[in-house]
Amino acid sequence: LEELTHEAWILREQGSGTRLTFDQAMRHHLNSLNVRLELEHTEAIKRAVESGLGIGCISRLALRDAFRRGSLVAVETPELDLVRQFYFIWHKQKYQTNAIREFLDLCRSLTAGVRRSDEIVLPSIA
């Protein structure tokens, strides 16, 4: 972990959920981090890291193809808590259609028991 604090970091912008999770996990090291770039899009972070500008912290699901191609590799950090929760929200007075209920059920079934985003198996669209 100490080695990571000396690297050039490419991160999401302040206020994004990913950045909040990262900042909380690295809270004891924030003063010593070298943040080279703050970008608003995950794809931009991937491209910057692939170009050798630094290291980043984004969802494994977003990186699945880059890992498969071998253009990026994961740095395992079991000592960091990088878990992030997502919630479904909707207007309390809006009617939920069958399609919305089916979509929510599908999302719950795809993520049941999943510990990391790259463990989600997305169905192919024919």
Residue ranges of model-derived segments:
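Alpha-helical segments flanking ligand/cofactor-binding loops in enzyme cores
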Residues: 2, 46-47, 101
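Acidic, Gly/Pro-rich loop/turn segments at junctions of secondary structure
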Residues: 1-10, 14, 61-62, 79-82
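Secondary-structure junction motif
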Residues: 7-29, 96-98, 104-105, 113-122
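Hydrophobic hinge/microswitch elements
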Residues: 20-74
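Proline- and acidic/polar-enriched loop/turn elements at helix boundaries
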Residues: 16, 38, 60, 78-79, ...
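A late-sequence structural motif
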Residues: 73-117, 125
